[in-house]
């Protein structure tokens, strides 16, 4: 038996007047997820345990079979692993976004989805001016970068994700608590460096949002993980364009597969991700495929973009995987789900349970659910489960098939 988890990041949503009271999942054309639902078992997954913020770090850790209560130490250390940045015992890694501020407001958490090439120049300029022996900036992908601070600086600071406070006053959401004085000075110090940079002057002239400030959040120390194979007896791989997910894979001892054209955005190589996933199962037992596009559309508050991202995920990822599975001599158990909702109206994450379907090429047992959406799955025979139990549940169902 081979095991596949397909994650449409942020697909779940709330009803919208603009969609006649439907959610994006209900409105979108998703024949492949619906077909899986008609021929599989449905339920709701709690990927964000009570007491945790609904970040993609916590939610995807759960989906990949790890209880956040046992393994979570922060988002940025996972991203550091993906970027090949070593963390010493007392090092604290921070996510460092390039953001857009305008008239004292945080107007864009992604600096207009700035290119990685542009962003590298900006982060290198900030590091040259503000970096030191105990503070190092590392360029990453698009707007997603890292700051590593030594000696535990800011480990317990209260840092707010910028996508949670779009159109909020920058001064109302600056870091607070331990180490916040240093972090605040870095943010303030980055603004004159970035606002006058030729990269941003060019972006503004082209009508694009500039990356005119850095912003810190998601900090933590390096975590300690048991490997996925140790936990479940399965070898596996992870496919994503997002450093966070790749970092989870590294700590879990999974192979991290880089797919050409995978961008972490609406223009990603959906089909390539699915094809690489199926190829990986020739010598592995398990693969997780993560697609970021629906989440990005939710953060933008863009209804049409989210509908398109969901439909692309269904057609090009789920559809490609289903066709390959049915044509194969292998047996497969496949789960499809979001990690968390990213409601268009809120433009940020929420914590409620998300719909999931479990489909097997062997199993004849089905329930009465026919469409993949937030409401229909409430009637699913699998009920409400903890996300971190899904891998074990997949294995148990496979044994019963």
Swiss-Prot record:
Pathway involvement of the protein, from the record: Carbohydrate degradation; glycolysis; pyruvate from D-glyceraldehyde 3-phosphate: step 3/5
Catalyzed chemical reaction(s): (2R)-2-phosphoglycerate = (2R)-3-phosphoglycerate
Superkingdom: Archaea
One of the GO BP terms on file: glycolytic process
Enzyme Commission number(s): 5.4.2.12
Pfam families with a match to the protein in the record: Metalloenzyme, PhosphMutase
Alphabetized GO MF terms: metal ion binding; phosphoglycerate mutase activity
Top EC class of this enzyme: isomerase
InterPro entries, A to Z: Alkaline_phosphatase_core_sf (IPR017850), ApgAM_prokaryotes (IPR023665), Metalloenzyme (IPR006124), Pglycerate_mutase_ApgM (IPR004456), Pglycerate_mutase_ApgM_sf (IPR042253)
Keywords noted in UniProt: Glycolysis, Isomerase
Family in the record: Belongs to the BPG-independent phosphoglycerate mutase family. A-PGAM subfamily.
HAMAP family: ApgM_A
PANTHER family: 2,3-BISPHOSPHOGLYCERATE-INDEPENDENT PHOSPHOGLYCERATE MUTASE, COFACTOR-INDEPENDENT PHOSPHOGLYCERATE MUTASE
Described function: Catalyzes the interconversion of 2-phosphoglycerate and 3-phosphoglycerate.
Listed name of the protein: 2,3-bisphosphoglycerate-independent phosphoglycerate mutase
Organism in which the protein naturally occurs: Methanococcoides burtonii (strain DSM 6242 / NBRC 107633 / OCM 468 / ACE-M)
Gene behind the chain: apgM
């Amino acid at each position: 038996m081979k095991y596949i988890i397909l994650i449409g990041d942020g697909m779940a949503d709330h009803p919208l007047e603009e969609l006649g009271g439907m959610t994006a999942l209900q409105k979108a054309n998703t024949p492949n997820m619906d077909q899986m639902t008609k021929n599989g078992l449905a339920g709701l997954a709690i990927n964000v345990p009570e007491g945790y913020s609904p970040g993609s770090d916590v939610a995807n850790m759960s989906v990949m079979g790890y209880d956040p209560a046992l393994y979570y130490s922060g988002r940025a250390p996972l991203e550091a692993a993906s970027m090949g940045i070593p963390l010493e015992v007392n090092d604290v890694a921070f996510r460092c976004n390039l953001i857009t501020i305008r008239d004292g407001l945080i107007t864009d958490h992604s600096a207009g989805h700035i290119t990685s090439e542009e962003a590298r120049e900006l982060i290198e300029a900030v590091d040259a001016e503000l970096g030191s022996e105990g503070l190092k900036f590392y360029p990453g992908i698009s707007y997603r970068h890292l700051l590593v601070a030594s000696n535990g600086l800011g480990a317990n600071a209260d840092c707010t994700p910028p996508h949670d406070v779009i159109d909020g006053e920058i001064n109302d959401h600056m870091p607070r608590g331990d180490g916040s004085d240093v972090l605040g000075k870095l943010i303030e110090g980055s603004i004159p460096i970035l606002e006058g940079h030729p990269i941003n002057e060019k972006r503004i002239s082209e009508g694009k949002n500039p990356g005119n400030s850095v912003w810190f959040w998601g900090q933590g120390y390096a975590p300690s993980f048991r490997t996925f194979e140790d936990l479940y007896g399965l070898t596996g791989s992870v496919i994503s364009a997002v450093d966070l997910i790749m970092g989870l894979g590294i700590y879990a001892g999974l192979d991290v597969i880089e797919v050409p054209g995978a961008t972490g955005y609406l223009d990603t190589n959906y089909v390539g991700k699915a094809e690489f996933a199926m190829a990986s199962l020739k010598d592995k037992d398990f693969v997780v495929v993560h697609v970021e596009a629906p989440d990005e559309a939710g953060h933008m508050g863009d209804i049409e973009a989210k509908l398109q991202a969901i439909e692309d995920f269904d057609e090009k990822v789920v559809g490609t995987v289903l066709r390959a599975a049915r044509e194969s001599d292998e047996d497969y158990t496949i789960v499809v789900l979001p990690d968390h909702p990213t409601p268009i109206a809120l433009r940020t994450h929420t914590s409620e349970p998300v719909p999931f379907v479990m489909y097997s090429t062997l199993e004849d047992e089905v329930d009465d659910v026919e469409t993949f959406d937030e409401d229909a799955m409430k009637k699913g025979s699998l009920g409400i489960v903890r996300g971190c139990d899904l891998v074990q549940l997949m294995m148990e169902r496979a044994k019963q098939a």
